[in-house]
Amino acid sequence: MRKFGIIGKPLEHSYSARYFTDKFSREGVDAEYRLYERDDLSDIAELMQALHGFNVTYPYKQSIMPYLHAIDEVAQTIGAVNVVCQGKGYNTDWIGFKESITPHLWDTDKRVLVLGTGGVSKAVQYALQQMGMAFTLVTRQKGERQGAIAYAELTKELMQSHSVVVNCTPLGMLPDIY
């Protein structure tokens, strides 16, 4: 039996185990998919040996990269990994975002506001760049990223001047919805 899973913390919100368990069952695949909630990556080498592949979620999309044997060119460019297969890291977040948002962007002059600077934000920024779309990045502190603005600088007018807002922060994740 092949073993797969997802690593991150928290994982209470994750539908991955249910989704893949159902998919494997429907398609007659001899595999299992489990949640691997971790406080840190201290056992990642053992986990990579035990699993055929796994997904990576918050907060490890960037910090897992030094542990990998190889990294796909796109994931390297993005600076974040969300899929690991046999020790090689990939990023599929960007294409998932691109495919999801494209039907809603009939006007290519839309201005996009990206909240957050973590792994998902990096994938979203990459997708927007691939689509030729301008965006404004919002960070915790002024000067954190060139061309970005701080949350403290967000105004009603600035929010209204952007037709798309993408939340790439952990705000609202279960179980800590606030």
Residue ranges and their predicted role:
Residues 9, 116-118:
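Glycine-rich Rossmann-fold phosphate-binding loop(s) that bind the pyrophosphate
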Residues 2-104:
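Phosphate/diphosphate ligand-binding glycine-rich loop within oxidoreductases
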Residues 147-178:
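Rossmann-like adenosine-cofactor binding region
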